[in-house]
């Protein structure tokens, strides 16, 4: 059934004359909007009142930082020298090649810069952002599935999908959907439950849970996901680049949770004048 569904899907969502809109691009836009809505509703539930203009500025800053960071990390860590020989290809984002780890770093930098401009507390803003971010991750992974990219290893399970092309004609794990469910829906539910705890959890807690949760899921999913062809397995064939980049996230996330608990700084939207 899942295999039949995949072959019914088209990477192009809308095509009208010279205008072509892909599901992958829509995933970014809708994901950003959903994250903004969750941020706004959560901060209202927490008793705060961020202005729509300030929230919009934060989201725009994060999205720009995310896209730049995601692309640069892919070029540096996954390009295997290709982009140094073809520098103009760095800007060909329509051909794919984005890294979550770079997107996380770039998004944080973009968000912090905007927070400084508008005197927003970056810790609380980051916590609010990651509460809704799993929805964007879920949509992004679903778009990966529609595009037939980042597929898994061969499997004889009934939900295996024949992606064709370079993936061949054998059924494979739909690893994109595994990630959509675990790092998307499951992580979103966990963060939603935590966001409703009283009293509010201290600044940095949600960011720590998100980073650690993603790192754990990504590290485990890599066992059933085919590594990037240009890199394969690293360190003697025991680990993938995705796992190598995810291990620090698990450690950093756990450290951030411990730090947040010891710091015990209450949530706030705006910095004191």
Predicted regions and their residues:
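Hydrophobic, membrane-interfacing alpha helices
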Residues: 1-273
């Amino acid at each position: 059934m899942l295999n039949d569904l995949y072959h019914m899907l088209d990477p192009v969502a809308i095509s009208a004359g010279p205008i072509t809109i892909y599901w992958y691009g829509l995933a970014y836009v809708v994901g950003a909007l959903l994250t903004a809505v969750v941020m706004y509703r959560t901060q209202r539930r927490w008793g705060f009142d961020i202005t729509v203009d300030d929230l919009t500025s934060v989201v725009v800053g994060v999205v720009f930082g995310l896209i730049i960071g995601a692309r640069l990390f892919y070029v540096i860590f996954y390009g295997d020298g290709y982009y140094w020989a073809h520098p103009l290809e760095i800007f060909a984002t329509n051909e794919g090649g984005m890294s979550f780890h770079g997107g996380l770093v770039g998004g944080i930098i973009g968000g912090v810069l905007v927070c400084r401009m508008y005197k927003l507390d970056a810790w609380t803003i980051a916590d609010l952002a990651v509460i809704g971010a799993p929805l964007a991750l879920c949509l992004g992974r679903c778009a990966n599935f529609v595009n037939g990219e980042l597929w898994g290893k061969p499997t004889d399970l009934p939900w295996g999908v024949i992606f064709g092309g370079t993936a061949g004609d054998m059924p494979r794990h739909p690893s994109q959907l595994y990630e959509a469910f675990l790092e998307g829906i499951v992580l979103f539910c966990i963060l939603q439950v935590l966001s409703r705890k009283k009293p509010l959890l201290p600044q940095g807690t949600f960011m720590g849970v998100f980073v650690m949760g993603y790192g754990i899921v990504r590290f485990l999913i890599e066992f059933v996901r085919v590594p990037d062809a240009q890199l394969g397995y690293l360190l003697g064939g025991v680990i993938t680049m995705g796992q190598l980049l995810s291990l620090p996230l698990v450690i950093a996330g756990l450290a951030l949770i411990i730090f947040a608990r010891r710091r015990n700084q209450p949530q706030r939207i705006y910095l004191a004048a």
